[in-house]
Design a protein with these regions (language model features):
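TPR/TPR-like (Sel1-like) alpha-helical repeat modules
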Residues: 223-229, 233-263
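Terminal, low-structured helical/coil segments at or just beyond the last alpha-helical repeat
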Residues: 1-17, 247-290
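Alpha-helical segment of the N-proximal tetratricopeptide repeat
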Residues: 18-60, 64-74, 94, 98-107, ...
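Structural marker of alpha-solenoid helical repeat scaffolds
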Residues: 54, 88-89, 122, 156, ...
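Structural signature of tandem alpha-helical TPR/SEL1-like repeats
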Residues: 39-46, 72-84, 106-118, 139-152, ...
């Protein structure tokens, strides 16, 4: 029959058309995924967009496309793809949290709170949801609510160090020094060699006027990261308050020299995109593993 079709130009059956379309889809999708893994993001997006024209229901393809868009800095398009996935999988918390992550990069804190509300309705025990919610509240300038969300997360998982670090930083910004000290102390007792923890501890001590302790702690930050510009800059202020003008000048010079050699990180959305590009491990979109 196939020979006769070739000889006499018989038309393809519906099944043959479907099989051809599936093969074309698989080929184009594969090329898109390969380009994505090679960090050829523009090319990946083109292939994956073409694949979705062949099969708009393939959610995995939308996931890969969202990653390509994030890497290209097209966050609105990435968010739209994640919305499509979420509409198809309304109980998928991992997708909602990815939406919150992209909204955070866009500095769209209202969108973050919306998706976090949806995630909490599905599972109010998920500590990551509270963490994202807190970041949104911080972005909106609602420090008390951010602290409340972080406290809820820590209450559910005591070793949620990222939540404690963020809470301690917010409390420090709000001049709630005794509360910030509790978080800094807890973190220092559990992960003493962490640069961010040491920096928080030093800043709390500095704010409390414990200049000798702060000077020592800033030194520990430098032991972990000899290129911490913030540590040198802030320790120079501590040393100046202690009357060590020479030491302060030395730290200021070091900070200035490093600042000239190492470009300061760009702020805002651009920096968040760069950070996300450095985290290009595939998201587990189809499993609620947050």
């Amino acid at each position: 029959m196939n020979i006769l079709k070739k000889l006499f130009g018989g038309q393809k059956t519906t099944e043959e058309v479907r099989e051809t379309k599936e093969k074309d889809f698989d080929k184009v999708k594969y090329e898109g995924v390969r380009a994505l893994r090679m960090h050829q993001f523009d090319l990946a997006a083109k292939f994956l967009e073409q694949a979705l024209q062949l099969d708009a229901e393939d959610l995995e393809c939308r996931d890969y496309l969202s990653q390509a868009y994030i890497s290209m800095g097209d966050l609105q398009k990435a968010y739209a793809q994640l919305q499509k996935i979420s509409e198809a999988q309304t109980d998928n918390i991992a997708v909602l949290l990815r939406m919150a992550d992209v909204a955070y990069m866009m500095e769209d804190y209202i969108a973050m709170t919306d998706v976090c509300d949806k995630a909490l309705q599905l599972d109010d025990e998920n500590v990551e949801t509270y963490f994202f919610y807190a970041r949104a509240c911080k972005g909106l300038g609602d420090a008390p609510r951010a602290v409340s969300m972080l406290t809820a997360a820590i209450g559910k998982r005591e070793d949620f160090y990222a939540a404690r670090l963020l809470r301690g930083s917010i409390l420090l910004d709000q001049a709630q020094l005794s509360e910030a000290e509790l978080d800094a102390t807890f973190l220092y007792e559990h992960i003493p060699g962490n640069e961010d923890v040491l920096l928080l501890k030093a800043r709390v001590e500095k704010a409390q006027g414990k200049m000798e302790e702060a000077e020592q702690t800033y030194g520990k930050v430098m032991d972990v990261n000899p290129f911490s510009i913030d540590a040198y800059r802030e320790r120079s202020e501590v040393r100046r308050s202690l009357g060590d003008s020479a030491g302060a000048a030395e730290d200021e010079a070091a900070a200035k020299e490093m600042g000239a050699e190492i470009p300061e990180p760009s702020e805002g959305i651009e920096q968040k995109i760069k950070e996300k590009m450095q985290q290009m491990d595939p998201y587990k979109v189809f499993h609620n593993e947050y």
